[in-house]
């Protein structure tokens, strides 16, 4: 809702003289919106990159650390309450896509339509992929990324990435 109707909701909130708070729509309990808007307001963002979905990160972590197949890791996530009964939005990357659209709007002022952003989830990731990544010194993470180009244009996408094990993102 925030990714597609955020501008309209903000306008309505201003008309009604109320606050429009949407911190939980990106990152859940991890504060990112307020620091971007308040603490880093004087900074110029060139790129936003991160792991934006806890369900997919849990699944990939189970595959990486415990050798659990995708389907079994998804089932564990559902049993543990990390995944919805219908996890499609998470595992297909749509939830992360909506979040990177919100963050891109805040960082760059560019409004991306989530339906027009390149988005690939984790449903095709196999244990063989995880093993190959390990041999390369990497782990697989679903990353949302938005980039401001030198010409002022911007693009965003969500896709599985090979992340070097030394990267801070690998430890998430």
Model-assigned labels for residue ranges:
Residues 1-39:
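Rossmann-fold NAD(P)-binding glycine/threonine-rich loop
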Residues 2, 66, 121-123:
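Charged, low-complexity surface patches
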Residues 15-18, 42-48, 153-154:
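Short coil/turn connectors at secondary-structure junctions
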Residues 20-24, 47-50, 142:
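General beta-strand structural signal in soluble alpha/beta enzymes
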Residues 37-98, 103:
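Conserved anion/nucleotide-ligand pocket segment
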Residues 74-171:
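Substrate-binding/catalytic subdomain of NAD(P)-dependent oxidoreductase enzymes
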């Amino acid at each position: 809702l925030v990714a597609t109707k955020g501008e309209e909701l903000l306008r309505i909130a201003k008309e009604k003289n109320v606050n429009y708070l949407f911190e939980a729509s990106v990152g859940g309990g991890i504060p990112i919106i307020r620091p971007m808007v308040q603490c880093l307001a004087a900074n110029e963002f060139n790129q936003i990159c991160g792991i934006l979905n806890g369900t997919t990160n849990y699944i990939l972590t189970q595959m990486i650390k415990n050798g659990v197949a995708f389907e079994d890791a998804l089932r564990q996530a559902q049993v543990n309450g990390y995944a919805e009964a219908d996890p499609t939005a998470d595992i297909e990357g749509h939830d992360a896509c909506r979040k990177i659209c919100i963050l891109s709007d805040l960082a760059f002022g560019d409004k991306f339509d989530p339906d027009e952003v390149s988005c690939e989830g984790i449903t095709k990731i196999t244990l063989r992929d995880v093993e190959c990544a390990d041999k390369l010194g990497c782990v697989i993470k679903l990353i949302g990324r938005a980039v401001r180009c030198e010409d002022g244009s911007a693009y965003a996408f969500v896709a599985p990435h090979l992340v070097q094990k030394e990267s801070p993102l690998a430890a998430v």
